[in-house]
């Protein structure tokens, strides 16, 4: 049997880049909760004893940026300098300006345009992907790496493994076969976990606890065999972590946020951006389109691309490829997609309810992936049943 190996990685919520994504999206949530028309482009960076938020925000909301930063860091578990950041005593720097009036007039006419007239907030191209290899219609490598990261955080917060600290990374290699263009997982080849830990735990206990409390509950037993390779904290020491170990920045984990290296990526990040930014809303609508194609049984695997020009509502192009797994020709699937999905940014925001913030709606997306999540707030995961035209 001809097989190949493919690998995806993830980082958990205490990774410095992911900390920054969560702060940026927590600020977006706060703005949209009070003013759904908020225009937000919020970046965050962090290093030892410091978090800075900066960017362009035009909103009627009254937002306490410093409180949001501290609350978000505290919620992740950054409560002392020992673990990488002290939420209550670190420096918080804020440099927020209004959205450029040049952009405002071109995109939304200073809030005068109707939803169907709102232009894209920038140029760019976005991809959506779906595959039938998991119930989530997501790549197995990405699903397993992401779930390992989430489980690491769970057993840290519930004190199952009290030696754990917030920062951590995971990586999973799966052996696949190609079945006429569809991806069929055979076995897990390698599992890698590097997690921050306290001074006192031994490497032997780290390995034993990770196997028992993280790997065993997450990796389906049918994918493990006696040849599966485990690299558990292979560097031998990971005490210094979080922003103390590495600088963090919003938008540096775009593959972890999407499909783990499968499909394709247009390069635009998600976090801290309101729905007029097609980097986010465009990527959400093409995920819904690709997922709907696979869920409707029209293909086993699907990628959809959309592209935009700044200030122009209609997309410049829509593309679909089913990797030769389509039950009908790709050109017919493309027509179905165009008939069933409105790619204009203002209409995406309405149809996917993207102007609703608050209750950590966007902050939730900023750790453990934007796609394949079973959560009603992830409206783009809702399948539209697509039926071929007679």
From Swiss-Prot:
ATP binds at residues 15, 167-169, 235-238, 246, 252-253, 269, 273, 277. Belongs to the AdoMet synthase family. GO terms for molecular function: ATP binding; metal ion binding; methionine adenosyltransferase activity. Mg(2+) binds at residue 9. This is S-adenosylmethionine synthase 4. Its cofactor is Mn(2+); Mg(2+); Co(2+); K(+). Gene3D superfamilies: 3.30.300.10. The keyword Nucleus does not apply. InterPro entries: ADOMET_SYNTHASE_CS, S-AdoMet_synt_C, S-AdoMet_synt_central, S-AdoMet_synt_N, S-AdoMet_synthetase, S-AdoMet_synthetase_sfam. The keyword Nucleotide-binding applies. It holds the Pfam family S-AdoMet_synt_M. It catalyses: L-methionine + ATP + H2O = S-adenosyl-L-methionine + phosphate + diphosphate. Binds 2 divalent ions per subunit. The metal ions interact primarily with the substrate. Can utilize magnesium, manganese or cobalt (in vitro). Binds 1 potassium ion per subunit. The potassium ion interacts primarily with the substrate. L-methionine binds at residues 56, 99, 246, 277. Its EC number is 2.5.1.6. Homotetramer. It comes from Populus trichocarpa. One of its GO terms (biological process) is S-adenosylmethionine biosynthetic process.
């Amino acid at each position: 049997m001809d097989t190949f190996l493919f690998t995806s990685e993830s980082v958990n919520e205490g990774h410095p880049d992911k900390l920054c994504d969560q702060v940026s999206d927590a600020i977006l949530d706060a703005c949209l909760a009070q003013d759904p028309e908020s225009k937000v482009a919020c970046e965050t960076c962090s290093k030892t004893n410091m978090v800075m938020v900066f960017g362009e925000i035009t909103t009627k909301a009254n937002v306490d940026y410093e409180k949001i930063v501290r609350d978000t860091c505290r919620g992740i578990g950054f409560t002392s300098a020992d673990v990488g950041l002290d939420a209550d005593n670190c420096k918080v720097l804020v440099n927020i300006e209004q959205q450029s009036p040049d952009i405002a007039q071109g995109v939304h006419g200073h809030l005068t345009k109707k939803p169907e007239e709102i232009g894209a907030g920038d140029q760019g191209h976005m991809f959506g992907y779906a595959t039938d290899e998991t119930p989530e219609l997501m790549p197995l490598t990405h699903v397993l790496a992401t779930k390992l990261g989430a489980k690491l955080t769970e057993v840290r917060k519930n004190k199952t493994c009290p030696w754990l600290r917030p920062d951590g990374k995971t990586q999973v290699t799966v052996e696949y076969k190609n079945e006429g263009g569809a991806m069929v997982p055979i076995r897990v080849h390698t599992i890698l976990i590097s997690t921050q830990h306290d001074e006192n735990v031994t490497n032997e206990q780290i390995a034993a606890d990770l196997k028992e409390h993280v790997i065993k509950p997450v990796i389906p037993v049918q994918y493990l065999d006696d040849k599966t390779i485990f690299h558990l904290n292979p560097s031998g020491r990971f005490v210094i972590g979080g922003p103390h170990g590495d600088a963090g920045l919003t938008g540096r984990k775009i593959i972890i946020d999407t499909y783990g290296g499968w499909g394709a990526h247009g390069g635009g990040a998600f976090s801290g951006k309101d729905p007029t930014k097609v980097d986010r809303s465009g990527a959400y609508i093409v995920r819904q389109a690709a997922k709907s194609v696979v869920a409707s049984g029209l293909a086993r695997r699907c990628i959809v691309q959309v592209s935009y020009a700044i200030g122009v509502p209609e997309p410049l192009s829509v593309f679909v490829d089913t990797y030769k797994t389509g039950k009908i020709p790709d050109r017919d699937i493309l027509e179905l997609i165009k008939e069933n999905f409105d790619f204009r940014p203002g209409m995406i925001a309405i149809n996917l309810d993207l102007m609703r913030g608050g209750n950590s709606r966007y902050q939730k997306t900023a750790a453990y992936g934007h796609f394949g999540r079973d959560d009603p707030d992830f409206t783009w995961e809702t399948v539209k049943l697509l039926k071929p035209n007679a």
